[in-house]
């Protein structure tokens, strides 16, 4: 079982998501908590992939064509940190 930690800033973003995206995010959390990032790779719709550049070390999963979850796996210890849920804006703020 994987633990999901939502960063303080990401909680604000999550609370302001449209209902459809919020439901998809909850489904994403269910999959990750049960089978981890490998479970996301088996579902093509999430298009889970590693990021490069200033987000190196993080991963991105697609919630729909516009919204992404940016997260990081900490020390392979079944711990996922959600850093950002964004409408495809990858700039660090």
What are these regions (language model features)?
Residues 4-8:
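PIN/NYN-family metal-dependent endoribonuclease catalytic core
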Residues 34-62:
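A short, surface-exposed loop/turn module that caps and links secondary-structure elements
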Residues 9-43:
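N-terminal first-folded block
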Residues 1, 11-16, 20-22, 61-93:
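Enriched for short, Lys/Arg-rich terminal
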């Amino acid at each position: 079982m994987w633990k999901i930690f939502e960063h303080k800033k990401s909680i604000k973003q999550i609370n302001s998501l449209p209902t459809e995206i919020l439901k998809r995010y909850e489904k994403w959390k269910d999959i990750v908590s049960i089978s981890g990032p490998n479970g996301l790779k088996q579902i093509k719709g999430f298009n889970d992939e590693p990021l490069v550049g200033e987000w190196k070390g993080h991963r991105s999963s697609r919630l729909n064509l516009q919204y992404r979850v940016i997260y990081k796996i900490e020390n392979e210890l079944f711990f996922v940190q959600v850093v950002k849920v964004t409408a495809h804006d990858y700039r660090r703020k």
